[in-house]
Amino acid sequence: QLTLRGSFYPSGKGYYAEHSDLNGGELILDIIPLSIVKEDYESGGLAIRSKQNKLINIEHKMRHGSVCYLKNSVNHKIQLIDKKKRFNKNLHIGRFSLISTTPKKINS
């Protein structure tokens, strides 16, 4: 079964360390942005590790309606959202997205 969850990375505080999803039971991860860099927050966001071992931020490529598909073996992270801004728990500013996963084995 597909799993759907929302994520929020607040401005000035939100990030997620680099990882792959090889051991998580997912085959494919798809990420649907609900906020857009330079519109809803200034910097940071989704970055992937290339085959040449280079970290590439792909957030600026995404628009409303985009879907980013990642194989479970691709290393990725969320770079700190708005690292030059101070975190304010009363503001809901930052990076929002929906994430769904396709399991490696689908029971029928």
Q: Could you tell me what each predicted segment is?
A:
Residues 37, 41-108:
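Catalytic core of Fe(II)/2-oxoglutarate
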